[in-house]
Amino acid sequence: MEERTFEMELAGRKLLVQIGKVAQQANGAAWVKYGDTVVLVTACASKEPREGIDFFPLTVEYEERLYSVGKIPGGFIKREGKPSEKAILSARLIDRPIRPLFPHGYRNDVQVIATVLSVDPDVQPEIVAMIGSSVALSISDIPFDGPTGAVAVGLVDGQFIINPNHEQREKSLMHLVVSGTKDAIVMVEAGAKEVPEETMLDAIMYAHEYIKQIVEFIEGIVKEVGVPKSEVILHEIDKELEEKVRAYATEKIYNALRTAEKKERNDNLDKVEQEVLEHFKEEYPDNLADIDEVLYNIMKEQMRKMITEERIRVDGRGLDDIRPIWCEVGVLPRTHGSAIFTRGQTQVLTVATLGALGDIQILDGIGDEEAKRYMHHYNFPPYSVGEVRPLRGPGRREIGHGALAERALEPVIPSEEEFPYTIRLVSEVLSSNGSTSQASVCGSTLALMDAGVPIKAPVAGVAMGLIKEGDVVSVLTDIQGIEDFLGDMDFKVAGTEKGITAIQMDIKIPGIDKEILKMALEKARRGRLYILSKMLEVIKEPRKQLSVYAPRVIRMVVDPEKIREIIGPGGKTISKIIAETGVKIDIEEDGRLYITASDLRSGERAKQMIEAITKDIAVGEIYLGKVLRITPFGAFVEIAPGKEGLVHISKLSKKRVQKVEDVVKVGDDILVKVTDIDKLGRISLSRKDALPDEEEEERN
């Protein structure tokens, strides 16, 4: 393919796409430049479908290269290791809008790789990668019902900004990413500072206008350099077999579905499956996989039919009904804060831990070095769904759910000045039947309040679903697992009473329009307020006192010029304070100092030691010091941490002293008076001028 270059203007910057320049052996490849950010995106597909699977094997990789920001990787090996959390979240951003646009039943392996080659701080590389993935797939022979476009949206001073720069992102009230086709929205992800539903909807639709321009641009590229799509050969089920299975199994599946409890429902469906397979195994011994597929289709149709025609869900709820909720706080006696949040058969335990500011997480990737003072981790063990599988650390889904819950609470976390602690939340999914990420949001709010963290407002979350059959649109509140699995949308919305703090929307159909979005956001608002009311019945506000097991923080402000003295040569002074008191000390460049102690007594002792260092030594003042070492000409005495002076042998006593050891020894606590401080800061001390005459006489 000959090299071709295509350009368009997008939100005040040039978007440049080069085709045929690099990676020509891939099915599709695009070199995309926006500002000074450059991303290479490739798409490859296997020639044959993978046998024996019932899912689409799509993998998306987002490769961060540190040379893109002029850095050399740390560590001994000096090369990039496993993907960062940011890279995993970016890969999910690319994956989610393109996945529903492949043909249903397509089983060829498809791999999309986005390699970040150069990063402009004002241009988010994940947005460039999302556009590049659409280009690479659209020009290739891989079946793909695109193209899609993607933009970021900020809100600064009441104005929407497309693809905001670094400074604008810092000021923005929302961080929104939207992807869509020419006709509809496909994916939404957002973090926001209590933004009203109307504003969020306006932002999404504003983004769609720019997405249309990107799609039109990519369609032009496809016309010029695109190749014909390969034929998709889908497995067809024998019509006679399908009719027989439907006639035999439809009513049985319908009855099995009408069960409120997930486990009982699954057991009933398993029994029907076994009964059907047993019934047809002699007539169709080689078509058992086809029978399973027909049963799946019947189950999906019947579940959706209940909703669209009967307006009732498999567990008996109406479309807007929320499952029963119960909450409990303070469930773990030795933790700093804990809560269990249960909604139906979804149950999450969230634990809050408070630490010193030195416990912050430092993120050093292709962006600016970032310090995270608040973090949320999400664990999804196999027992939560009654399964057995190896425990191998968090997967992409767990990292994504943890990040969503973290984003939902971030706007209400108090500032470092208000609450000088590092905060870690861990959500343990104890039982799962849909919407565990939003249960984690609710559990996190309760755990923070139980820990005494002065959050600005409580946050709750709810997952919305969609069943769309022709013109009949049914939006579901608080979806359970089967409705997520067999439905058309998973739309998670978290927020406070005032507005939205986080959104994540994924769909399985080609797209949804403004009216569906508007309906879903309004129903989510009502659901969120109901859930908040249930949570506040358990704990109305953050506790006034921290847990007795939580660390105590003492704040000080010192003269920045004194920081060097507090630290001491090679960190000797501060290390001594920490060793003697058992505290943690964090010092900011502007003189803010935080002492984190397990108890107030040790914290106060460390504070006194620091005050002694920062207090200026004055001539004529008397101090209680400790003898550090002895020389033939005198004794060196520490009068404050890191500050010592010399008591000359002639200043030890009013009487003549033959040997220093005759008067003092190492480790003695003695009173001394400052007699002089020279230009170099050396301190001269006198013992004989500090003691009353009678005490001197008594000693001698």
From Swiss-Prot:
SMART domains named in the record: KH, S1
Signal peptide (from-to): none
Pfam families tied to this protein: KH_1 (PF00013), PNPase (PF03726), RNase_PH (PF01138), RNase_PH_C (PF03725), S1 (PF00575)
Organism superkingdom: Bacteria
Gene3D superfamilies, alphabetized: GHMP Kinase, N-terminal domain, K Homology domain, type 1, Nucleic acid-binding proteins
Alphabetized GO MF terms: 3'-5'-RNA exonuclease activity; magnesium ion binding; polyribonucleotide nucleotidyltransferase activity; RNA binding
InterPro entries associated with the record: ExoRNase_PH_dom1 (IPR001247), ExoRNase_PH_dom2 (IPR015847), ExoRNase_PH_dom2_sf (IPR036345), KH_dom (IPR004087), KH_dom_type_1 (IPR004088), KH_dom_type_1_sf (IPR036612), NA-bd_OB-fold (IPR012340), PNPase (IPR012162)
One cellular component (GO) term of this entry: cytosol
EC number of this enzyme: 2.7.7.8
Catalytic activity of the protein: RNA(n+1) + phosphate = RNA(n) + a ribonucleoside 5'-diphosphate
KH domain mapped to chain residues: 551-610
Transmembrane regions listed in the UniProt entry: none
Binding site for Mg(2+): 484, 490
Keywords: Cytoplasm, Magnesium, Metal-binding, Nucleotidyltransferase, RNA-binding, Transferase
Main location: cytoplasm
Protein's UniProt keywords contain Nucleotidyltransferase: yes
Start and end residues of each S1 motif domain: 620-688
Cofactor dependency: Mg(2+)
CDD domains: KH-I_PNPase, RNase_PH_PNPase_1, RNase_PH_PNPase_2, S1_PNPase
Subcellular location: Cytoplasm
Any GO BP annotation: mRNA catabolic process
Protein task: Involved in mRNA degradation. Catalyzes the phosphorolysis of single-stranded polyribonucleotides processively in the 3'- to 5'-direction.
Similarity annotation: Belongs to the polyribonucleotide nucleotidyltransferase family.
Protein name (database record): Polyribonucleotide nucleotidyltransferase
Protein source organism: Thermoanaerobacter sp. (strain X514)
Gene name tied to this protein: pnp
